[in-house]
Amino acid sequence: MHLMTDISQFSKWNKDLSGAIAALGTESFFPKLIEAVRGQVRIDYPQVWLYHRDLPPRVLYHEIPQHALESQVDQYLEGPYREDPFYQTSMNQPRAKIYRLSRVALGELKDSTYYRDYYGDTGTCDEAIFLSKLDGGNVINLSMMRLPEHGPFTDAEYENLYLLAEPISELIKRHSEHQEFAASN
């Protein structure tokens, strides 16, 4: 996929993003938002996580096949989330709206306990998140992984994700402010 410099790609983004905007406050918001991202950059196993400061994380939405659910979600919630560089970043005054795992882990991911005890078994080779800060210090992350057969994000793909980060982060925040979402989370 190309950067959003070509008019047809930009047009697709506008159309897909409009679908997500129309779905704000409904159950179809996260699927529509992920569809918009996928229209720009290939992503695998998208997951939306709510991080509370004093509670374990909660998966709000995912597109993980059944065979990978245990390694992607269940094992994560058993405790490795505390070592997750994304979780730690999210709970410590994050400044950016997008992060890439290799950059957050400062190139030391494969030497970490988190990698040995959890991440190495997930079957993913790269990951990036869109981060949205909510009131009260809570955070929602849209996690986007890459499987080995698709390779890590290229610099151009990550640059494209970077361009998408502001509107996506803001939309997630606005979605969280809708009554139906707030009442159930």
List the predicted regions and their residue ranges.
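Signal-transducing coiled-coil/dimerization helices and immediately adjacent hinge/linker segments
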Residues: 173-185
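Basic, alpha-helical nucleic-acid-binding regions used in initiation and control of genome expression
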Residues: 2-5, 184-185
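A contiguous pocket-lining binding segment that forms or flanks enzyme active sites
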Residues: 156
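Regulatory input/activation interfaces that engage signals or partners
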Residues: 5, 12-24, 28, 32-138, ...
